């Protein structure tokens, strides 16, 4: 059940992430509501195309693998994501004595910032703030920009981001429609607070508050008394309800098995080091694969120089198990090469096949040299 609950937050339907990892069908609740999600038997999921970037290179030894909890299979110690996902998806958690609250940022801005840090590792947090303007949350809402707070987050990993709900005034119906709320706040919390203010007589301008969430998205409606100024009502609500709230950033991460608090700039630099390591390992993996292939083809090339001799050796061998040793002895090739050659069908030894293999040998030599 815990795994399913975790997956719910990763789905497109839950709307917690700017870029969901899981494409979903069914009811997965909403991050801005306490509405329960459906049981697993009523939902369908599959990895989103976005995940191709999360797992890129995982089959090329880009990261280390270890045994899972019961040693029945191997699992990666970390995923070789091709972009700084830790800054694109919000992260929240508590370990022993360590709390973590990492805000999400716009993917395009993070990519621009990463490229800038790659070109200039000495880039300052202020220069970075020109490219990465501020955190960006899936719930929407306006960021109340404060340069000092933003620079603190970028430099130290600590600070707060103030968010304010977005709304429109429907003059015809004389009501306020709240369309976006701060990240981490639920519609139930807001309604409960507004209802309490109405009961205590502190919000006489509002006659009713309704949850109008539907398939089209989030909507919280406030009916107003005639002659009420909607701007003044919202100013009061921003002050007394979660329609305006803050997100406290605390960027604690694990680097080389050690807990560290990093700012955005340091995170990008650490991710660049990690990604360069992944890319280097992928190149080594591909080079080794090409070297193995070249080794087999070099053995095949030796056979192709005297194909009649190879056929004679096979034909004159009495037992199947002696074919490999006899080819090894006859052409001075190793067992791996002999096994590879023995598996090739006779029909493949035509002129076209031979020319293609010779070209492939030359191509592999060039690629490995590069």
What are the roles of these predicted feature ranges?
Residues 1-56:
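Long, structured ligand/cofactor-binding scaffold of large enzymes
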Residues 2-14, 70-82, 155-160, 196, ...:
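Conserved alpha/beta core surface patches that mediate binding of polyanionic ligands
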Residues 12-17, 51, 84-87, 161-169:
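Short beta-strand elements
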Residues 16, 59-60, 83, 90-91, ...:
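Short coil/turn connectors at secondary-structure junctions
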Residues 21-28, 62-64, 249-250:
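A short alpha-helix capping/helix-loop junction motif
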Residues 30-33, 54-81:
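P-loop NTPase nucleotide-binding/switch module
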Residues 45, 49, 91-94, 98-370:
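C-terminal interaction appendages of subunits in large macromolecular complexes
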Residues 71-88, 93-96, 100-101:
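Long insertion/accessory domains within large nucleic-acid-processing enzymes
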């Amino acid at each position: 059940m815990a795994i399913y609950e975790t997956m719910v937050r990763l789905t497109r339907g839950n709307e917690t992430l700017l870029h969901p990892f899981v494409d979903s069908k069914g009811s997965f609740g909403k991050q801005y509501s306490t509405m329960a999600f459906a049981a697993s038997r009523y939902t369908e999921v599959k990895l989103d195309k976005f995940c191709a970037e999360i797992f890129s290179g995982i089959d090329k030894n880009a990261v280390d693998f270890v045994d899972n909890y019961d040693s029945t299979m191997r699992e990666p110690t970390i995923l070789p994501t091709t972009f700084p996902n830790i800054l694109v998806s919000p992260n929240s958690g508590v370990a022993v004595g360590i709390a973590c609250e990492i805000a999400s940022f716009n993917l395009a801005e993070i990519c621009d910032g990463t490229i800038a840090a790659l070109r200039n590792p000495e880039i300052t947090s202020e220069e970075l703030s020109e490219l990465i303007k501020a955190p960006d949350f899936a719930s929407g809402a306006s960021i109340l920009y404060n340069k000092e707070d933003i620079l603190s987050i970028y430099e130290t990993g600590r600070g707060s981001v103030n968010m304010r709900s977005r709304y429109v005034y429907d003059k015809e119906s004389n009501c306020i429609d709240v369309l976006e709320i701060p990240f981490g706040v639920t519609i139930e919390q807001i309604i409960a607070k507004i209802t309490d203010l109405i009961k205590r007589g502190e919000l006489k301008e509002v006659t009713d508050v309704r949850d109008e969430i539907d398939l089209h998205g989030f909507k919280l409606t406030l009916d107003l008394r005639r002659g009420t100024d909607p701007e003044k009502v919202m100013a009061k609500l921003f002050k007394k309800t979660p329609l305006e709230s803050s997100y406290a950033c605390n960027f604690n991460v694990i680097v080389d098995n050690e807990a560290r608090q990093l700012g955005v700039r340091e995170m990008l630099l650490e991710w660049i080091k990690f990604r360069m390591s992944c890319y280097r390992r992928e190149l080594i993996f591909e080079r080794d694969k090409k070297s193995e292939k070249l080794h087999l083809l070099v053995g095949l090339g030796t056979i192709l120089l005297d194909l009649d001799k190879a056929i004679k050796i096979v034909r004159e061998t009495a037992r199947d198990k002696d074919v490999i040793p006899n080819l090894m002895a006859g052409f001075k090739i190793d067992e791996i090469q002999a096994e590879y050659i023995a598996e090739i069908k006779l029909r493949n030894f035509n002129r076209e096949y031979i020319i293609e293999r010779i070209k492939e040998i030359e191509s592999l030599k060039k690629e490995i040299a590069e």
